[in-house]
């Protein structure tokens, strides 16, 4: 027999997944703007605001389920994990906006094309992690979620290698500042994908792990 709480949890699952899709879209738009030297600041800001509103709706839904149905420990685990994931998706959106805003303010859009192999690899790794985190949530795939840990270590290596390269650059102009900040935002997004992965593993198996 299906519990009323189960229906509510299914609704919560859909809400969080849609938030993840929106967050992934925000990152894709910001990266597209970065690579194509196009100002996507307003578009990404709007997406980030939408994700923020979705997070509030998710929190309200979670509290509604807790108050109405007084869930047992296993259900509370799921609800709490979804709230954590929603927060991390909100951070995806915020960092996407930070990337676009930094590009617009410092790089003046057309002056700083991304050409470094290290930065391009960093972008590829991080966007892949974002997509994988959303896919793992949709499927409640603990094994897929666990793979985010190894990729995050690769991102850290690329990030520090890129920092080392920038530190040796003769020019310390706005392009260098822009690339430095963007690489940091990408590294932070990667961190948040591992937090999502940890929560997915907990939802699927009840196992508490650290992926970073």
Regions from the language model: what does each represent?
Residues 1-212:
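Cytosolic, long alpha-helical scaffolding segments
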């Amino acid at each position: 027999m299906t519990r009323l709480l189960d229906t509510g949890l299914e609704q919560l699952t859909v809400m969080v997944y849609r938030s993840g899709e929106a967050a992934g879209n925000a990152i894709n738009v910001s990266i597209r703007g970065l690579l194509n030297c196009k100002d996507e600041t307003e578009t990404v800001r709007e997406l980030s605001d939408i994700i923020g509103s979705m997070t509030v709706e998710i929190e309200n839904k979670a509290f509604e389920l807790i108050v109405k149905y007084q869930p047992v420990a296993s259900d509370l685990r799921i609800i709490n994990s979804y709230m954590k994931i929603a927060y991390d998706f909100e951070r995806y959106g915020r960092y996407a906006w930070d990337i676009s805003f930094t590009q617009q303010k410092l790089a003046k859009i057309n002056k700083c094309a991304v050409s470094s192999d290290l930065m391009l690899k960093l972008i590829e790794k991080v966007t892949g992690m974002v997509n994988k985190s959303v896919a793992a949530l949709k499927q409640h795939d603990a094994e897929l979620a666990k793979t985010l840990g190894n990729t995050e270590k690769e991102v850290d290596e690329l990030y520090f290698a890129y920092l080392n390269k920038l530190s040796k650059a003769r020019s310390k102009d706005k392009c260098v500042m822009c690339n430095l900040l963007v690489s940091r935002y990408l590294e932070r997004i990667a961190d948040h994908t591992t937090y999502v992965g940890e929560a997915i593993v907990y939802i699927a198996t009840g196992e508490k792990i650290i992926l970073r």
